[in-house]
A protein has these predicted regions:
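Flexible, glycine-rich phosphate/dinucleotide-binding loops
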Residues: 38, 88, 159
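Conserved SGNH/GDSL esterase-like catalytic core that processes O-acyl groups on lipids
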Residues: 46-132
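Cytoplasmic membrane-interface segments at the C-terminal ends of transmembrane helices
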Residues: 72, 235, 266-269
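C-terminal or late-domain output modules
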Residues: 45-49, 242-270
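Alpha-helical cap/lid subdomain in secreted, periplasmic
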Residues: 96-242, 249, 261-264
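Polybasic, low-complexity, intrinsically disordered segments
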Residues: 1-26, 139, 143, 147, ...
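Serine-esterase "nucleophile elbow" of acetyl-processing enzymes
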Residues: 3-80
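Short, function-defining helix-loop hinge/capping sites that tune catalysis or transport
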Residues: 42, 118-120, 256-257
Length: 270
């Protein structure tokens, strides 16, 4: 320091707190994903019920993430659901392209179950392709909306859903229509081949969740649920009474709670 330098002021103004990267009260929400976000089988058999969606639904019984963040009127005006029943990770870039047109402040992502729910385990989406499409989706979002936030839900524990749902004779009949055959096919079979098949699917779900966590962690405006959806112990009350696999209205409300907790937390969940 040179001799002519001014002495530091004793009452230096405190530097303003930096604006946090994560806004815990975003002003608009766009949802992308699959049948869970469409409320499939929550209200009627083999039908979407977007009003019961955990992300953007208007149902008072669900109290969706959008309603919790924006209020009922705000959610009706500033939340959009671009999820599609049957969607896989390969469909996410296209859904994201639709969502960015709305310029949402928060995008919710719940996808991956259909990548594991194939006719056979060998038909499941490879982990490398799953990662590439997720990275592509976040990259395109970031390019269009640099400050948009992302909530990423983990893929549910499909093996637990099999374990819970197989106690229902009606549920098992609906499963035969082709709901997640890689996990739910031959639901009562407990031989070594069936056990290996289910364990293979379960391992793939865990690998998908690892990808979701890792890719999200690379983006400062992305929050993963810390595995909360995967860890949630769905009971029959939280499962559709038609297929005992998709969330019921009660189950959708639990998903909304998990999402709201993650989005409004002071620090990201790990």
């Amino acid at each position: 320091v040179g001799g002519d330098s001014a002495a530091p002021s004793e009452k230096a103004n405190p530097s303003p707190k930096p604006t946090p990267l994560w806004d815990r009260s975003p002003g608009s929400v766009a949802a992308v994903g699959d049948s869970i976000t469409r409320g499939f089988d929550a209200c009627d058999v083999l039908s979407d019920c977007p009003e019961a969606s955990w992300a953007t639904g208007a149902s008072p019984e669900v109290d969706s993430l959008a309603v919790r963040l924006l209020g009922r009127t705000g959610a009706a005006r500033r939340s959009w659901n671009y999820a599609v029943t049957g969607a896989r990770m390969a469909d996410l870039p296209g859904q994201m392209a639709q969502a960015v047109r709305r310029k949402p402040q928060l995008v919710t992502v719940m996808v991956g179950a259909n990548d594991a729910c194939r006719r056979t385990p060998s038909a499941m989406t490879p982990v490398s392709a799953f990662r590439a499409d997720f990275e592509d989706s976040l990259r395109s979002l970031r390019k269009a909306l640099p400050k948009a936030q992302v909530f990423v839900a983990s893929v549910p524990n499909l093996k637990r859903l099999w374990s819970e749902g197989r106690s229902s004779p009606m549920g098992k009949q609906v499963w035969k229509l082709g709901i997640c055959p890689s996990m739910l096919g031959d639901a009562d079979a407990l031989d070594s081949a069936a056990t290996l098949r289910r364990d293979t699917v379960q391992k793939r779900v865990e690998d998908y969740n690892k990808v979701l966590k890792e890719v999200c962690a690379e983006d400062k405006r992305c929050r993963y649920d810390g595995g909360a959806v995967y860890d949630y112990r769905f009971s029959t009350a939280q499962l559709s009474r038609w297929d005992y696999f998709h969330p019921s209205v009660n189950g959708q409300a639990r998903l909304a709670e998990i999402a709201y907790r993650t989005v409004t937390a002071k620090k990201p969940l790990t």
